[in-house]
């Protein structure tokens, strides 16, 4: 009777050595993001972080998000170096809306078969996003789960914690009729609407490598999400910000009302900016109604800020000095009864 061949975890599809190699590869990316509040090093069971001492009454603000089906395009076109930036951006841009400074970030990377090179590229992108937003990449989890994902497909989730002075929380309660609205330009579709984008590509049979205004269509679609943290922290410190809306899934119609009092509505001047060419292409190729465009995509606007009308000029000057493309996009008006809270003229 023959002796059965001993089985190992690797025989079952989990390569511990590959996981260890990944940890070694990403150490420099993690180190680059370190903040003075971080205690200990990568690899502990839990990650430790002190609260910054400058806060008198600190309030923690948390958020979690993913990259959605933009990952499908990234995987299909083997473009893994910027989806990590997307992951961080989707989390930290939500935190800054409430005035919070991002403090630390954790990621979850799940795959059927761990490809160390791909995972390293992704996590390096996460490190870059954390560096751009000033938060520490403090830990994460890499889960190799054979049978759960097809081949080397992977999924990402991010978790971020920020901190804000209790007296300085931005929650929209200061918004009032007469306030001005400022828009900050997006870098593209960011990380929302990609199921519709992929449907447009399928139905139109467009070549993703086709030229669109000087660069391939796929480059427009995979442009990483813009991170607004540093410029908005400066604006918050130097102006009187009443509210901010991160234009993500649900577009204008769903996100702006989240930060408005019931008695206010946002009046947006639709002719105050020109949609980036990728949105014009999507609308034409997919025969998408304008209402649906504003419901699904950011249409070139990644963030909207409400502030007193007499602060507009100084705010625009500050934002442009910080490298933002920003403009006066509309105003806040009184809302009557059951009026819609967003009006695009």
From Swiss-Prot:
Keywords: ATP-binding, Cytoplasm, Ligase, Nucleotide-binding, Purine biosynthesis
Catalytic activity as recorded in UniProt: 2-formamido-N(1)-(5-O-phospho-beta-D-ribosyl)acetamidine + ATP = 5-amino-1-(5-phospho-beta-D-ribosyl)imidazole + ADP + phosphate + H(+)
Listed GO CC annotations: cytosol
Subcellular location: Cytoplasm
Domain of life: Bacteria
HAMAP family noted in UniProt: AIRS
UniProt-recorded name of the protein: Phosphoribosylformylglycinamidine cyclo-ligase
Organism, scientific name: Shewanella amazonensis (strain ATCC BAA-1098 / SB2B)
């Amino acid at each position: 009777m023959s002796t059965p061949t001993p089985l190992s975890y690797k025989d079952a599809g989990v390569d511990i050595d590959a996981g260890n190699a990944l940890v070694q590869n990403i150490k420099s990316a993690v180190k680059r993001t370190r903040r003075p509040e971080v205690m200990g090093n990568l690899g502990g069971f839990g990650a430790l972080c002190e609260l910054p001492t400058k806060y008198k009454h600190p309030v923690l603000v948390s958020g979690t998000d993913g990259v959605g089906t933009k990952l499908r395009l990234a995987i299909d076109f083997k473009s893994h170096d910027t989806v990590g930036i997307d992951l961080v951006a989707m989390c930290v841009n939500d935190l800054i809306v409430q005035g919070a400074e991002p403090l630390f970030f954790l990621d979850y990377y799940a795959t059927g078969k761990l490809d160390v090179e791909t995972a390293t590229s992704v996590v390096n992108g996460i490190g870059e996003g954390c560096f751009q937003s000033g938060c520490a990449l403090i830990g994460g989890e890499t889960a190799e789960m054979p049978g759960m994902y097809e081949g080397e497909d992977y999924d990402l989730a991010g978790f971020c914690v920020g901190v804000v002075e209790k007296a300085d929380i931005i929650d929209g309660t200061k918004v009032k009729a007469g306030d001005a609205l400022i828009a900050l330009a997006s870098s593209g579709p960011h990380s929302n609407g990609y199921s519709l984008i992929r449907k447009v590509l399928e139905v139109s049979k467009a070549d993703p490598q086709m030229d669109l205004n000087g660069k391939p269509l796929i480059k427009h679609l995979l442009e990483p999400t813009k991170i607004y943290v540093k410029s908005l922290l400066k604006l918050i410190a130097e102006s009187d910000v009443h509210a901010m809306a991160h234009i993500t899934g649900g577009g204008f119609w769903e996100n702006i009302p989240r930060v408005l009092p019931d008695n206010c509505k946002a009046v947006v001047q639709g002719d105050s900016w020109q949609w980036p060419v990728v949105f014009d292409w999507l609308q034409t190729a997919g025969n998408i109604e304008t209402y649906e465009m504003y419901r699904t995509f950011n249409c070139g606007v990644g963030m909207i800020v409400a502030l007193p009308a007499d602060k507009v000029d100084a705010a625009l000057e500050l934002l442009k000095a910080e490298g933002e493309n920003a403009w006066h996009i509309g105003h806040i008006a009184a809302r009557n009864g059951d009026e819609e809270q967003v009006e695009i003229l």
